[in-house]
Amino acid sequence: RPVQPKHFDQYWQAGILSWDSGIEMNLHGPYYAELLGNRRERNRSLAKMEASMQAGKIINARHLVYHVGPYGEYDPGTEANEQVANIFSGIVDRVRSIWGEQDEDAYTAFPWISEQEPSLVGIETSGRQELWGTVEEVLEVCNHVEGTVPVLNLGHIHARGHGSMRTSEDYAELFDMVRETYGGSKFYCHFAGIEHRMGNALHYTQIKKSDLKFEPFAEFLAEEGDWMDITIISDSPLLEHDAMYMMQHYDKARQRLMEIRARDERRIKLAKESGLTPEELELLEQEVAEAKTREEKEDSKSPAVTAKAPSKMMSFDSPEDDDDLF
């Protein structure tokens, strides 16, 4: 049965604001779910998800993000993935039917209904070994269910991989795998610092306190992200602070990349003017830098000349009156 979301007015106002200002809205469903549980547990989870599906229409959510929950009686593998695919196929159908329930008044209240597609259903990667949701599992289900998209929670992936996301190459490998398996250039991600142990996420933390650093991700985005249409959601306890922190580090990474490219362009130009190849000019610059380093080391090894301390002499001068110093 339909579940009327609470605080309807606030949801609707948020939808109108996002529509008028061009801000993309996304909505996260219940954080706890048991979609692989028995019928009672599954239906209870779906009933809670129903309210978020209706709220998604009211706020014009572009993505509705859901967790699957524990494996339950299933073992990781094909059977569990098929069950998840069947469940999410029904969820996609329900979302589309909610968006299709409309009348003439709805076009005025919800102008996006006639111009936007229904919300996409996001399936989020999990951060614990007992929960369904490895990257491979999520990609397999999304490939089989139209209307679903993978949600890459990078903190969860890092934790489940025993701290696997440490360099820009790690991110390149992950996104290349997603592109080859799922296709497309649109990506939806969550990012936050995370505490983890033995392949299990414990809790989110601010990015500065985590071994999951944003700088390598920013470096990857700056160098290879031109082909990507990516949305990054801050999951940090310091929500706005770490969102700005990520934006600043991405801007810094872009600036560094521009400086490197400008330097390389100058080197190529100088090489052409000098009649050298860029490689020969770079080798010459390295030799000059090494020679300068050797000179600095030799200068530091030479004995320093110390000034002779003045001999202490007995003075009979009376001390000056310092009362007028301040």
Protein language model regions, located:
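Hydrophobic faces of well-ordered beta-strands that scaffold small-molecule active sites
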Residues: M25-G29, L64-Y66, V121-I123, P150-L152, ...
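Active-site beta-loop-alpha junctions enriched in small/polar residues
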Residues: P30-Y32, G69-Y71, E124-R128, G155-R160, ...
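C-terminal helical cap(s) of enzyme catalytic domains, especially alpha/beta-barrels
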Residues: E240-E259
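Well-ordered, non-membrane alpha-helical segments in soluble/globular domains
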Residues: P5-Y11, M49, N81-S89, S168-F175, ...
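Short amphipathic alpha-helices and their capping/turn segments at secondary-structure boundaries
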Residues: P5-S21, E50-K57, T134-E146, E169-S185
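Gly/Pro-rich active-site loop or hairpin
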Residues: D75-T78, W132-V135, H158-D229
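N-terminal pre-domain/capping segments
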Residues: R1-G29, L35, R39-Q54, E259-L325
